Amino acid sequence: YAVSPWTRNGGVFTEHAAHESQIMFLEEWSKAVGKGFHTKEINPWRRAQFSNLVNMLDFSYHDGSVLKLDEVPEASKDPITDQYNGADVCALKFRSDVQPTVPYNNTEAQSLRVEKGYKPVRGNLTEGHYLTFEKDGKALQHKGHKLSLTNACNDHDGKDMRFVLWWQGKNPKDNAFYISTADKHDRKYIASSLELTTKEKAAQFSIADLGNGKGHVITEIDSGKQLSVEKDGCVALTKNASDAFKVFSVTF
């Protein structure tokens, strides 16, 4: 979790990170305030491959309002020693049920249950999400035989708007993906022509976060062209496109 005025309502951040990422974030912060330092203990490969977490922050939006937190009871203390005794109180309260029971007879549907909803995405992307890509009230859709646009919906979860990424890199920061439809029973992949095709004919795309709320740019790697929304409402690959898409991670 990241708590700051620049991460409020920030949603999902999926860049590859490790403990070193926190140190690299402090390095970036120290440079920004004019007191930079460099930690030599982080080896070059990890420094190159893991996130410095800066993309978590949106410096174009600031919310400094004070959160209203729920009231919680004061932690229990022993009346004689004045030491915290929460573990003993818990053991006494639940007696033989201190350890959770083994969840026998649970089904896969129960164990993998998640809440329905959506969150905006920050940072460069990874696998493991259903994603929608939107711009100016329109959303990319895979209805028919070619990538096209439709009106976005409030919950960002239209069946024809959901896409899945398939990572094609070797190192964590390799930004190369197949983009497919979400239906595992009739999965189609986006080709360089933006038509929907088989995996064997799929194109590889990079998806880069421009930072500070500007959105993500989608680039077809072989041609170097970027996914763009044309004036006539069609989707095309063009050079130096200015279009960036807002990305939402969706569960349904």
Name every feature range the model reports, one short phrase each.
Residues 1-29:
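Substrate-binding rim/cap in mid-to-C-terminal beta-strand-loop elements of soluble/periplasmic
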Residues 8-11, 31-39, 226:
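Substrate-binding/catalytic groove segments of enzymes
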Residues 33-70:
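Polar, surface-exposed loop/tail segments
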Residues 67-130, 135-137, 146-162:
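Long, His/Glu/Asp-enriched segments that create or flank divalent metal/ion-associated functional microenvironments
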Residues 89-92, 102, 242-252:
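Extracellular low-complexity, O-glycosylation-prone Ser/Thr/Pro/Gly-rich "stalks"
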Residues 103-145, 164-194, 207-233, 249-252:
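Extracellular glycan-recognition/adhesion modules and their associated mucin-like linkers
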Residues 143-160, 191-205, 230-243:
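Short, tandemly repeated low-complexity microdomains enriched for cysteine and small residues
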